[in-house]
Amino acid sequence: MTTTKNFLPEQYRQNNKLGINHNYLNQQFLDHEAIWSKMREVVINGDFTLGSEVDLLEKEYAQISETNHAIGVGSGTDAIFLSLKALGVGEGDEVITTAFTFYATIGAIVTAGAKPVFCDIKADYNIDPSGIEAKITPATKAILPVHWSGKPCDMGAIEEIAQKYNLAIVGDACHAISAFYKGRTAGSLGTLACFSFHPLKNLNVWGDGGIITTNSDELADKLRLMRNHGLVGRDECHIF
């Protein structure tokens, strides 16, 4: 039996005493043909944009996330940006988050036209809920917790604050695919959850990709329009 570990360079194997298969960008895939056959199928069918494979991914991802909807997008960055815009976040609004994150979290807030408001973190590098309430102003529209390294934030406390002040929660779950918080999947936490399929993530694609999960029918419908320029079929376009 061939293991993934055997494909790694000798120096990497020596440094990896526990045999943990960390993401290694030059690592060979175990089953080339399974991947290539699926890619050939897509090419032959000409199913390049939002086709049947994306539909299947969304269906299965919603199932594992235990949510009503999963909406595929171009990247984790797109997922955060589109989620904010779907909630109506824009010029003059504020979003509470943490500075301990990849730039895309903050970049999405700024690109949406809003102002990031930084809250301190705890020893686990996740946002400290005890500091959130003091950051809330009349301009606050959402809380954006980052589940750093896949460890979910203290969502019980965050959801309690969000409910008290009628705020949306957009979870940056780009590290948290298949993570759980008190029996709930990371995808089911908050108003919307955003995931990344970047090659460095624990579930990745060839290139880049992302997905948004939610239980809101209204937000899901809006996001499906927004990810594709508001197009409904070929002859109708919604302007946001």
What are these regions (language model features)?
Residues 24, 38-39, 61, 79, ...:
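Generic structural signal for small/hydrophobic residues in well-ordered secondary structure
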Residues 50-54, 76-80, 102, 125, ...:
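Conserved donor sugar-nucleotide recognition element shared by glycan-biosynthetic enzymes
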Residues 5-7, 176-182, 189-240:
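Active-site region of PLP-dependent enzymes
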Residues 59, 156-159, 208:
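Active-site phosphate/pyrophosphate- and oxyanion-stabilizing loops and adjacent acidic/basic residues
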Residues 7, 85-173, 180:
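PLP-dependent aminotransferase-like
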Residues 1-86, 90, 111, 163:
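Conserved PLP-binding active-site segment in aminotransferase class I/II-type PLP enzymes
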Residues 65, 90, 138, 187-188, ...:
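Structured loop/turn residues at beta-strand edges in well-structured enzyme cores
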